[in-house]
Amino acid sequence: MLRSTHPPPSSPSSSSSGGGGGGGSSASSSSEKTMVGGGGGGGGGSGSAAPSGAKLLQILNVRVVGSGERVVVLSHGFGTDQSAWSRVLPYLTRDHRVVLYDLVCAGSVNPDHFDFRRYDNLDAYVDDLLAILDALRIPRCAFVGHSVSAMIGILASIRRPDLFAKLVLIGASPRFLNDSDYHGGFELEEIQQVFDAMGANYSAWATGYAPLAVGADVPAAVQEFSRTLFNMRPDISLHVCQTVFKTDLRGVLGMVRAPCVVVQTTRDVSVPASVAAYLKAHLGGRTTVEFLQTEGHLPHLSAPSLLAQVLRRALARY
């Protein structure tokens, strides 16, 4: 998901200032077990309950565009917001109703709505997704998730299999950290250095990370990703990264029943190609892998027409 070109500071800094605290900048060697049964429920730091469905539609800037009977949900990844889909959206709206929303951590969402305790694991993000679908009275959809949203979609489909006809997982990983018998792409010590760099100087880290993540030589894509990355409040960005890197979904992949399409670029700094093979072998639903002939973690920004062809092909068959 992230790497930094900047070395860690000589003396580690505490996590960035800002409301609620990021929960410290240390990574745990034992991954958090995400609850498949649900319930990020209420209470975070303020003890407030999760917003109602109607209120959530407003908070997360939910939009429904396009026409057609079939519904597609587009869910963006870390460091972006729903605008990341703008280049592929025209390829989908002619034949589908498309639901777009912002994750609560996105810079386009009022940061007062980010409850550090509630969003300390992915279950609360799953709650938000399911609440949106219920509020819109959507009985069935195809879900397209990028990076962390691929994880969210996997968990949501396990909790509510009736809702999800297909999952399209872009730059997906069930676990970003390496293990004794698994190559996720990152060592624990490496991630700790990234957390330290984010906490010490978020601007410097983001400036170095954006071109690495985009990968391909597409300056406009780097500029766009930089914009949304800088829109995130630094302490929220760090907290989200810590949450993602302590998550391990390998044990629940077999519970997925929806057919899946895993979309992988030829070189992704965040997700090795071996992870796509792992997902194909372990997801419970019928799974195919589509390799895009481009580099980078954000093909919807760097190669939108190429990704759109894969999406149209995948979404024509559900």
Swiss-Prot record:
Regions of biased composition (Gly residues) lie at: 36-47
According to the UniProt record, what class of enzyme is this?
hydrolase
A GO CC annotation given for this chain: cytoplasm
- Annotated phenotype, changing residue 268 to N: Weakens interaction with D53 and attenuates strigolactone-induced degradation of D53
Main subcellular localisation? cytoplasm
Q: Where in the cell is it found?
A: Cytoplasm; Nucleus
GO terms in the biological process aspect are: secondary shoot formation; strigolactone biosynthetic process
Q: Is Cytoplasm a UniProt keyword of this protein?
A: yes
Q: What happens when the gene is disrupted?
A: Increased number of tillers, reduced plant height, and elevated levels of strigolactones.
Tissue-specific expression: Expressed in the parenchyma cells of the root stele and lateral roots, vascular tissues of vein and leaf sheath, ligule base, auricle base and stem base.
Q: What is the effect of changing residue 297 to Y?
A: Weakens interaction with D53 and attenuates strigolactone-induced degradation of D53
SUPFAM superfamilies referenced in this protein's UniProt entry, alphabetically: alpha/beta-Hydrolases
| Region ranges (Disordered) | 1-48
Q: Which GO terms describe its molecular function?
A: hydrolase activity
Q: What does this protein do?
A: Involved in strigolactone (SL) signaling pathway. May function downstream of SL synthesis, as a component of hormone signaling or as an enzyme that participates in the conversion of SL to the bioactive form. Strigolactones are hormones that inhibit tillering and shoot branching through the MAX-dependent pathway, contribute to the regulation of shoot architectural response to phosphate-limiting conditions and function as rhizosphere signal that stimulates hyphal branching of arbuscular mycorrhizal fungi and trigger seed germination of root parasitic weeds.
Q: Which family is this sequence assigned to?
A: Belongs to the AB hydrolase superfamily.
| Quaternary structure, from the entry | Interacts with D53. The interaction between D53 and D14 is enhanced in the presence of strigolactones. The interaction with D53 occurs in the presence of (2'R) stereoisomers of strigolactones, but not (2'S) stereoisomers. Interacts with SLR1 in a strigolactone-dependent manner. Interacts with D3 in a strigolactone-dependent manner.
Q: What protein is this chain from?
A: Strigolactone esterase D14
The gene it comes from is: D14
